[in-house]
Amino acid sequence: VRRHVLFAEEEIGSGDLLMIVKNNYHYTGKQQQQDRQENPEQQPGDTNFIANGDTARLRRIRRFEDFYGFRFAQASLVFPDYDDMELECQVLLDTLSSESPALTREQSSRLFFAVAEDYADIPSKAKRYKEVRENPYFNAMQVKFAYAVTCHKAQGGQWRCVFVDRMLFGEETISRDLLRWLYTALTRATEKLYFINFDERFFEDK
């Protein structure tokens, strides 16, 4: 969609729509701490974490970085579902084009131990572990482009206009699982709904 409809050729750029693909607790806590320092009288927000499936708009990229065998972007993300909350964070770019939903277990372990090497001089194992858990690269937002999403990822969200492509479900005959999938897909639209690659047997004759 991004390349053939929006004619975007760069790896990622300002304005791109992204979906978070793994819960992230690091940056919201950091942002709330900064807000309290800047405005002590301000009431703390109720956004404790960014959830898997949340969408964000990429406002700007400060720089690209290659660390620990992975590629990152230091970026600013705006979250429309959280009153346009803006977070400065590291974004992990490897997940954009990977086949897996997020980093695999092997990749996560590789990143963990690569980051841990930076703290090898800390004698306490518990303190080393704590440093890794607070490292911005280890906690980078794992994202994918959100111009088209699976029905599973779309659960809980709604859009004015929705395109439903049945071919993504496969050639399976009408079954209970397919009908459940259809119900979820069809109820994501609030105004317009378009059916793609649907056989006419799915529609009643008038």
Predicted regions and their residues:
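Core RecA-like ATPase module of SF1/SF2 helicases and allied nucleic-acid translocases
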Residues: 1-205
